[in-house]
């Protein structure tokens, strides 16, 4: 900057001297090197004592900021004739199946229908919808997934499963925050055991990466307690084939941490969270059946040999503090664990035996709308109201999905035949809310 410019600057008359750089902000718009005109304009935004000389600062940055503010001020309303808060109150009532269409209307609707505020308001007002997400494996080992809307009773489209899990085996699946579905670990046919973690956001309908696990593992146990993801045991290629190690992922901290090791190495076969503890049952290093329970409050494992694990079979789940399991191959009977007698008791019977074929086998039992949802390998589902087991209630035990209701009857029959031939089966089943 030349001397004449400094004399003409008001800062010079006040006895201030240009120094570089005294600006304590990351945003500076002065561009002192461009001449007197810029310095004078810079006084509008930067105090005279904090002018700096930074030739790489963009002089249009503040202008763009103002322009953005102006655009926000004059942007059209979400719904013509309505204030935005009232428009949001209307849009959050749109059924979840139509949210994909909302995102196509305009950029403002896209941002709204993809943001946390939109879905937090739906949850606050009791309008969130639970959908069932099902992962299947066909005879060729390919993984596919579908989601079922129990309200419209239709299967909805989903983005493809990421390539790293399209043929993986022994991977875990869990839900955090009600809307994030995680896939983690497993064994890739080419790469072997993995530490990889990815998650699907039901609000945006997209996949994302998450921090890798601390240990490679496959065929391990996993659960969610207090919105933290726990994994334990399993196998890993190498000298120590069966693992004792366990770890936890905290989404708030976005990192994994080791927890106490299991008492013995184990490949878990079934697991459930019950009474604030994580119960696992599986095979030890010498193919012996073993059971352990983890208490997160004291970070310790302990062997279990009571009546619960003695009569424990998969699939099972806990709902409202009670532990339920299936008592029939096709899921037509339910049983419940009675803590007072330390035994499993018969609970409900649909009186509608479907058969013993592989396609009719009940593969998953999950809570849905405060009821129990039974999912079979042929993608048929039954919803059971266990809150009031009144035999006269016609909706006590109802079928909500008959394998692909969006298809014709002929295609359903063909799919059933093809399903038996392909020996496709369900690998994981979860419920996500949005």
Swiss-Prot record:
Q: Domain F-box: where?
A: 76-122
List the protein's name. Answer: F-box/kelch-repeat protein At1g55270
Gene3D superfamilies in alphabetical order: Kelch-type beta propeller (2.120.10.80)
Cysteine pairs bridged by disulfides in the record: none
Q: Where are the Kelch repeats?
A: 129-178, 180-227, 229-276, 278-321, 325-371
Pfam families given in the database record: F-box, Kelch_1
Which organism does this record belong to? Arabidopsis thaliana
**Repeat found in the keyword field:** yes
For this entry, list what GO says about its biological process.
Answer: regulation of phenylpropanoid metabolic process
- Where is the secretion signal located? none
Which keywords, in A-to-Z order, does the entry hold? Kelch repeat, Repeat
Q: Which InterPro entries match?
A: F-box-like_dom_sf (IPR036047), F-box_dom (IPR001810), Kelch-typ_b-propeller (IPR015915), Kelch_1 (IPR006652)
């Amino acid at each position: 900057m030349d001397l004449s410019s400094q004399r003409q600057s008001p800062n010079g008359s006040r006895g201030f001297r240009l120094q570089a750089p005294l600006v304590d902000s990351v945003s500076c718009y002065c561009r002192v090197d461009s001449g007197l005109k810029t310095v004078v304009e810079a006084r509008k935004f930067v105090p005279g004592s904090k002018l700096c000389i930074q030739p790489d600062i963009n002089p249009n940055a503040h202008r763009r900021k103002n322009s953005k503010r102006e655009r926000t001020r004059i942007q059209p309303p979400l719904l013509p004739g309505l204030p935005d808060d009232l428009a949001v109150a209307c849009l959050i009532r749109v059924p979840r199946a139509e949210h994909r269409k909302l995102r196509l209307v305009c950029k403002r609707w896209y941002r709204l229908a993809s943001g946390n505020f939109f879905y937090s308001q739906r949850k606050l007002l009791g309008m969130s919808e639970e959908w069932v997400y099902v992962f299947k494996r066909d005879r060729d080992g390919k993984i596919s997934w579908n989601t079922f809307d129990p309200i419209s009773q239709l299967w909805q489209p989903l983005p493809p499963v990421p390539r790293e899990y399209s043929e993986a085996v022994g991977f875990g699946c869990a839900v955090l925050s009600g809307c994030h579905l995680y896939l983690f670990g497993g064994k890739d046919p080419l790469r072997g055991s993995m530490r990889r973690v990815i998650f699907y956001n039901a609000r945006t309908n997209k996949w994302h990466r998450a921090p890798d696990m601390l240990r490679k593992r496959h065929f391990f146990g996993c659960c969610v307690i207090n919105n933290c993801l726990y994994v334990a045991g399993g196998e890993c290629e190498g000298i120590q084939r069966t693992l004792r190690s366990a770890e936890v992922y905290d989404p708030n901290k976005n990192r994994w941490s080791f927890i106490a090791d299991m008492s013995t190495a184990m490949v878990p076969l079934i697991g459930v969270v019950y009474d604030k503890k994580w119960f696992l049952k599986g095979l030890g290093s010498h193919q012996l059946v073993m059971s352990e329970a983890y208490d997160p409050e004291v970070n310790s494992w302990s062997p279990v040999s009571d009546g619960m694990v003695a009569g424990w079979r998969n699939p099972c789940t806990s709902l409202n503090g009670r532990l339920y399991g299936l008592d029939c191959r096709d899921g037509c009977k339910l049983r419940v664990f009675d803590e007072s007698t330390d035994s499993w008791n018969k609970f409900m019977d649909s009186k509608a035996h479907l058969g013993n074929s592989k396609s009719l086998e009940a593969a998953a039992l999950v809570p849905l709308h405060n009821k129990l949802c039974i999912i079979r390998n042929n993608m048929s589902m039954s919803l059971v109201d266990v809150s009031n087991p009144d035999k006269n209630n016609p909706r006590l035990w109802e079928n909500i999905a008959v394998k692909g209701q969006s298809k014709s009857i002929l295609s359903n029959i063909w799919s059933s035949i093809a399903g038996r031939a392909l020996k496709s089966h369900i690998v994981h089943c979860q419920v996500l809310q949005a």
